[in-house]
Amino acid sequence: RYQPEFYEDTKTYVTKRTSSKKLTQGLNLYSQNQKLINQIENEFKVEKELMLALMGIETNFGTYVGKMDILSSLATLSFDKRRSKFFTDELITLLQLIESGKVDYKSLYGSWAGAFGFFQFMPSTIDNYALDYNGNDKINLKNNIDAFASAANYLSKIGWKKERPCFYKIELNKKIPSKYLNTCLLYTSDAADDVR
């Protein structure tokens, strides 16, 4: 409800979460895992820069993954009338992942909303996209090998195209009241000309 991604426009959100310190952290993580990250980039056709940026935004490169027991979080949230079905489905999926042995229930600490690992996957995302990339018969999203491969697999499967722009300059219909377009206008006015 009170998460900044819901009340800050994209430009403000990204600017507040990027710094030269964070850039240095990302470069250090890349240099320590260069072979793995390059292999995953080539296999899944997802840029290493995108994966590192997402990990930096989501968990500060794995240094803050959350401390909440996500089983308890999801059980509690499943009683919240606003999104009861969503969180109940996530809870059931998590229980199925535990029962099947795909995830270790002792490691399931993450966000208050039930997200887990270096890239903050919800249980349904784990179920649909996470990979046991190191072949140890467990999906460990707090391990760089499984985490990067799972993030790349997720992005690839939802349609990410390497070296294609993710934003396009658009012409806004002047009949649409600007109060509905503020986030779009604020972001696109500064960033649309800078797409890669």
Task: Write out the residue ranges for each language-model feature.
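Short, functionally critical alpha-helical segments immediately adjacent to catalytic or ligand/cofactor-binding
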Residues: 1, 47-62, 94-99, 151-152
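Secretory-pathway/luminal and periplasmic proteins that interact with or process carbohydrate-rich
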Residues: 1, 59-68, 80-84, 101-106, ...
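An acidic, Gly/Ser/Thr/Pro-rich helix-cap/linker signature
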Residues: 1-32, 38-41
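Solvent-exposed, acidic/flexible segments
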Residues: 23-34, 43-44, 63-67, 80, ...
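Substrate-binding/active-site groove segments that recognize
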Residues: 69-78, 91, 115-131, 151
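A structural motif
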Residues: 95-104, 113-133, 158-164
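Acidic, glycine-anchored loop motifs typical of Ca2+
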Residues: 132-141
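Single conserved hydrophobic/aromatic residue that forms the stacking wall/gate
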Residues: 187-196
